[in-house]
């Protein structure tokens, strides 16, 4: 990923599904995206609180695609997210929401049926850690790693992914060329 921070516009968005939908439809934002050749649009906004909890980020995603990465034209419209700058670790939230944009889902324990691939999900080990796409509280920990699930890496002897079960790194390798050609 490359960050070109000079292409910034001020907004007052909060992390909500309604605001993500308005981003998709906003012709000015689409024009800026085209003008700056942005593969993704990330809006730094604020958290959305409700009786169900606090939403620190929200993203367009392609869950449940049954191991078929959609063609360029269909998928590129999902490449928007809102990340709150007033809610937890903004960097991890930013990475998590981009993970959704790139076809990754939460952990199997959270009920994820995968992202673009059935195994494109987060991973965690009870009382030890959770990877970027997994919620740490589901694994009784506060230790969220700044890694996507990857069976090729280990932390204190524990693999941070499982082949064909939780391997976000492999999924990202497979979708890289499609994403790079969005703009």
Residue map of PLM features:
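Extracellular (secreted or membrane-anchored) zinc-dependent metallopeptidases
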Residues: 1-183
């Amino acid at each position: 990923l490359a960050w070109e921070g000079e292409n910034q516009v001020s907004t007052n968005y909060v992390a909500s599904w309604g605001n993500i939908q308005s981003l998709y439809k906003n012709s000015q934002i689409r024009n800026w995206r085209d003008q700056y050749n942005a593969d993704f649009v990330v809006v730094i906004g604020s958290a959305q609180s409700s009786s169900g909890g606090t939403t620190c980020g929200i993203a367009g995603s392609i869950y449940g695609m049954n191991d078929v990465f959609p063609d360029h034209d269909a998928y590129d419209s999902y490449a928007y997210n809102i990340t709150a700058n007033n809610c937890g670790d903004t960097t991890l939230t930013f990475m998590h929401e981009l993970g959704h944009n790139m076809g990754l889902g939460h952990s199997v324990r959270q009920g994820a049926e995968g992202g673009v691939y059935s195994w494109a999900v987060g991973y965690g080990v009870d009382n030890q850690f959770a990877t970027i796409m997994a919620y740490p509280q589901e694994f009784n920990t506060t230790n969220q790693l700044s890694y996507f699930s990857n069976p090729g890496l280990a932390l204190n002897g524990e693999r941070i992914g499982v082949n064909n079960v939780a391997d976000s790194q492999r999924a990202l390798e497979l979708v890289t060329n499609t994403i790079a050609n969005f703009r």
